[in-house]
Amino acid sequence: MAILKNDWAPLLEEEFHKPYYIKLREFLKEEYRTRTIYPDMYDIFNALHYTPYAQVKVVILGQDPYHGPGQAHGLSFSVKPGVPIPPSLANIFKELHDDLGCYIPNNGYLVKWAKQGVLLLNTVLTVRRGEANSHKGKGWEFFTDRVIELVNEKEDPVVFLLWGRHAQAKKELITNPRHHIIEAPHPSPFSAARGFFGHRPFSRTNAFLQKVGREPIDWQIENI
């Protein structure tokens, strides 16, 4: 299992020794040994690897990883280059185009966002191939709740983008009045037309960041 190497490491060190995590680790060892699990074991913590704690400006919460071959690589909503853009991400790009005029790219690889301080965090970090929510309730929620609590403790103002009921359930962890929450329905084709389209999260995020003296995000994902 990959161990954290940046400033998240001391902050999350004690989580790795808690009974829930030790149990989760044993479960995952067996799952990776006997089944096809996504993402690759070495990509599980990529959201934390790509976005150090000190650099977090925006959080986009997802649910669990994509469960198709070659899609998930540890960042919520993101897929590896060369993989078709999933429907929810296609709707995110459509809203980004309508909001800021960004062209719709030929890939869904969101590492550029992560490297600018956008924490792309799923609340569950692993999944069985072809079985959505198969690792729900196994312990990841305790771990990712702690990540959200740590971001909540930051002095620097952070924008939380909470799309859909699952993400909005985490609002109770965001108690620091410095931070800014933007809520909308999930970008899934089942709900995007009910208020995701037109809520302009990207321009609103940048307006807030600029208001508090932080660099805005360059949201354009380039063609590969």
Curated annotation (Swiss-Prot):
GO CC list: cytoplasm
Please list the reactions this protein catalyses: Hydrolyzes single-stranded DNA or mismatched double-stranded DNA and polynucleotides, releasing free uracil
SUPFAM superfamilies, from UniProt? Uracil-DNA glycosylase-like
Subcellular location(s) of the protein: Cytoplasm
Record-linked CDD domains: UDG-F1-like
| Active-site residues, Swiss-Prot/TrEMBL | 64 (proton acceptor)
Please list the coiled coil stretches.
none
- Lineage: superkingdom: Bacteria
GO terms for biological process, alphabetical: base-excision repair, AP site formation via deaminated base removal
Q: Which keywords annotate this record?
A: Cytoplasm, DNA damage, DNA repair, Hydrolase
This entry's Gene Ontology molecular function terms read:
uracil DNA N-glycosylase activity
Q: What is its EC number?
A: 3.2.2.27
Supply the NCBIfam families for this chain: PRK05254.1-1, PRK05254.1-2, PRK05254.1-4, PRK05254.1-5, ung
> What is the protein's known function?
Excises uracil residues from the DNA which can arise as a result of misincorporation of dUMP residues by DNA polymerase or due to deamination of cytosine.
- Please give the family membership noted in the entry: Belongs to the uracil-DNA glycosylase (UDG) superfamily. UNG family.
The protein, known as:
Uracil-DNA glycosylase
What are the leading ranks of the lineage?
Bacteria, Bacillati, Bacillota, Bacilli, Bacillales
Q: Which gene encodes it?
A: ung
